[in-house]
């Protein structure tokens, strides 16, 4: 059963430039093999997000939380938590996103990358306008097993992106 999730779009679209700084403390790497995919690359000048790539120090910080995420609802026997970890759903969610033929039209003129982490879908990149961002968020939220969608999308060229940028890209 889908639970309603409050719309986070307005607040997240206004995220500050502090979020856009590259991570300090070493090379970034996708330590946990979280699904990370480019859905579109139509908007020139849109910086590639760091996505799930983090430093060694950040990996150590995340490890404990990630080990526990999703086990509470599974242990309670909730019907939408058949897997023992929320991260076990991620590959299937990413496959559903790749297979969704309707996303192509939704993303025209944008550059969007997706990260899936523990049934949460992060949409990062640059879109034409708020309507396109809202359509993408609705489409992603409708996919099976997605608990939350977090849109970190730049609406206007020249503004700092509301996400961490992958250094050197």
Describe the predicted segments one by one:
Residues 2-8, 13, 19-169:
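N-terminal targeting leaders
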């Amino acid at each position: 059963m889908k639970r309603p999730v409050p719309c986070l779009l307005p607040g997240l679209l206004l995220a500050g430039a502090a979020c856009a700084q590259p991570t300090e403390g070493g090379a970034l790497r996708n330590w946990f093999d979280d699904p990370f995919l480019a859905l579109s690359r139509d908007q020139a000048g849109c910086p590639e997000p760091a996505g799930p790539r983090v430093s060694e120090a950040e990996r150590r910080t995340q490890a404990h939380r990630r080990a526990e995420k999703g086990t509470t609802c599974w242990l309670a026997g909730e019907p939408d938590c058949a897997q023992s970890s929320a991260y076990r759903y991620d590959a299937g969610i990413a496959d559903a996103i790749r297979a969704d033929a309707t996303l192509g039209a939704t993303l025209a003129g944008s550059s969007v990358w997706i990260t899936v982490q523990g049934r949460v879908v992060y949409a990062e990149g640059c879109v034409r306008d708020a309507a396109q961002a809202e359509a993408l968020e609705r489409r992603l939220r409708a996919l099976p097993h997605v608990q939350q969608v977090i849109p970190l999308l730049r609406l206007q060229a020249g503004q700092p992106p509301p996400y961490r940028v992958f250094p050197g890209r």
